[in-house]
Amino acid sequence: MLVNFEGVDGVGKSTQISLLKEFRNDAVITKEPGGTEFGLMVRDYLLKNASKISNKTEIFLFLADRAEHYEKVLKPNYANLVLNDRSFVSGMAYAMANDSSLDIGLLLDLNKFALNSDLGDKFVFLKADEILLRNRLFSRGTSDEIEMRGIEYLMRVQGFMSIILSDLKFDVLEIDASLEVLEIQEKIRKFI
């Protein structure tokens, strides 16, 4: 079973995946981008240079990583529980936040091609308000090129994530990221 964890930076995806791994030590943990050697290169490049390339180039780099990730990580582990930190939903949402004129149908078709139409079984969507995001990102003390686009940008991305997950009628657990960490974990365990 493929469970995709979605949400913008700072909502607690990695924390929840780590806690779930303690509960299900047979789970395979991965992330996009960065779940493969190629993905690490893409991730590193984009975190440092996102403002230097066109939106289309950024989309295709993420799609290339997604295709490689599918072939090297997701497909070989199909029989296992796979916990994926981000998925095509993030890719589409960030792309649409950068250019709201993009066709959601085209983006979905490109992602289906990259993923051999295997979009995932369940989605955990952690949502936060502006205050929570600002506090969490400030407490980290670090920011990459994408985070430097600002809280308003991240809220726009989150809005597109919500639209995509709702429109595509996936099996989604939407959770308020301001809840206690263990309360969130309990909801996720029941969902999976």
Swiss-Prot record:
Cellular component aspect of the GO annotation: cytosol
Q: What does this protein do?
A: Phosphorylation of dTMP to form dTDP in both de novo and salvage pathways of dTTP synthesis.
- Domain of life according to the entry: Bacteria
Which reaction(s) does the protein catalyse, per the Swiss-Prot or TrEMBL entry? dTMP + ATP = dTDP + ADP
Family annotation (InterPro entries): P-loop_NTPase, Thymidylate_kin-like_dom, Thymidylate_kinase
Q: Where are the transmembrane segments?
A: none
**SUPFAM superfamilies registered for this protein in UniProt:** P-loop containing nucleoside triphosphate hydrolases
Q: Which gene encodes it?
A: tmk
Organism lineage reads as:
Bacteria, Pseudomonadati, Campylobacterota, Epsilonproteobacteria, Campylobacterales
The EC number(s) attached to this protein equal: 2.7.4.9
What protein am I looking at? Answer: Thymidylate kinase
Which major enzyme category is it? transferase
Gene Ontology BP annotations:
dTDP biosynthetic process; dTTP biosynthetic process; dUDP biosynthetic process
Q: Which HAMAP family does this chain map to?
A: Thymidylate_kinase
From which source organism is this entry?
Answer: Campylobacter fetus subsp. fetus (strain 82-40)
Which NCBIfam families does the protein's record reference?
DTMP_kinase (TIGR00041)
